Amino acid sequence: MSRLFTFLCLSLLFNLAQAQLPTPEYKKGQAILSGTIANYNPDDNLIFKIGAPNIVMGTAETLYPTVEADGSFTINIPLYHSAQVRMIIGNADLVILLSPEKETNVTINLSNLPGKQFVYSGQYATINNEWCQPELITKIPPVYRDGDLLDSIAGISANEFKERCINQYKQYIAHNNTQSQFSEDTRTLANLSCAFDCLENLQATHYCLQTAYQKKENITREQAFAAFLDIHLPDDFHNYLKDFPVNHPLALYCYNYRNVVTNFLYDTHYDPLSMEKYLLENAPLTKEEQTLIHQYEAAFKAGVIFRQQNDLMTLIRKYTKERDDCNWKIFSEAKKRLGHILQDSTCLPVDYIRAIYMRSSLYNLQPLTSRQEIMASEITNPIFIGIIQDMNRQMQPRKKA
């Protein structure tokens, strides 16, 4: 036992020694991506775009590099911290690890075989070159977008679906861990990326099974929503989360960390009508507005298209206080729910839920509300804090000279 423990400790020390990446830190700046595209022809109208992520907003700013006639390009990419950015060029869709104020160069030849299409130098060259190799598994596709996968899960239970997802994830991690030709950092980031993609599928379990049912029965999306409205996940369904590396010190390098918390917020009884129900109970609605909501609920439950969707959205926007009250309730419960599963109210995923709560104002180019400021004050992660503070400053009214 003593020898085994010593071996495990030495293995851990070796892995730590091999790993070079530090924990990412907040540092707003411009990453520089330069490169050359072999055999470039301006008349080919090559698709070429970059996605610069904002982890708090869960979105990416789309940038279009200007390519010179000789195929060379240089683009500045705004980042809040070292992170993977997405690059789509031709039929290739990949991520590149970049840092603010650092330059990475890439030579692109799309006619080459996979693994040789992109050759990097500069910052994170080893990780970026290894990431492109076909022997490394770096992503798990969303089940709800794959027709064959949907066919394979039609009629199975939520727990069976969960088991499939987790087994697939474990197989991919086991495979990556045998690829000793790649650096520890590269394998760690690949495994984290697979974990976060798996979490997207697990959180979408109800929707995946619903979409599989829709495809099998050849019914409309509305009919499928109605059929699954009263079907819920087991109360302990999301306990798997404590076995995932959601609090890993390198997690925020990953482009897909946003998959760790989706719109479902780990709610086993997610209710797509929650906002409308809250307004009926708490907002001073007119009789016409009450009727509109009741008509929407009836249409939803009957599985038919609701023709007054724009009127409903206008109504929801009208009752700002009640809408904010409902969102505060939803996010407070989600924060508590995740903290209970992970037994830590200050861990990264719980902080991320707090950060996501800021989106409603920042999306609309508005400064944070008093409630959002209260929840923002609970955040401990420096990257989330830095992004929120920077964006909130930009939303403040400018003082007159």
Where are these regions (language model features)?
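Bacterial Sec-dependent N-terminal signal peptides
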Residues: 1-25
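N-terminal start-of-domain structural block
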Residues: 3-4, 69-71, 323-330
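Alpha-helix boundary/interfacial micro-motifs
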Residues: 13, 87-88, 214
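A non-transmembrane, solvent-exposed segment enriched in polar/low-complexity residues
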Residues: 20-189, 202
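Oxidative protein folding and maturation machinery
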Residues: 119-401
